[in-house]
Amino acid sequence: ADFLFELGTEELPSSAVEKLGNLLLENLCEEFKKLNLNFNKTEAFATPRRLGAKINELDCITPQSIKINWGPSTSIAFDSSGNLTKAGEAFANKFKLDRNALNQFIKQDGSQEKLCYEEISMGVGVETLFQQIILSAITKLPISKKMRWSTNRDYFLRPVRWAVLMFGEQTHKIELFSFTTGNKTRGHR
């Protein structure tokens, strides 16, 4: 689905507008790539009162991932009688494994046999990650002189007045600079 984010502000310095618009898009793309999300065409837009990014055909769900957790070698995890040692028990406790079934979790790691547990993480809907992705992308913008306005504790180059966040046909609401994102943008004053 298509992703659209727009940040509406008071007048931005003309020297920073285009650079910030492009960097916002780059930062968002970088965050999506970290999550192994695919997308197609991207577009940055910036005017003195808004910074925005549009990303076409963004994946809706993060891919499933498998994390391999290696434990101690079998010579350390089991004593000479085949009973669990403290290292083997710690591995079983860490991953909540049945101590009697640890033989299922033995794999060859190059030169030796070790305990090994594979964690499968199911993909999550990308909408649940928008808050952290957007905050990270904004935080990485190189802003030397930040302003604080009103009573909130947020800082940005100029006071933020609105934010738009859409994914596909849906409006997504996240908290950003004491605003809730919506689907309404503003034109000239």
Model regions and ranges:
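Long, basic N-terminal domains or extensions that often function
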Residues: A1-R189
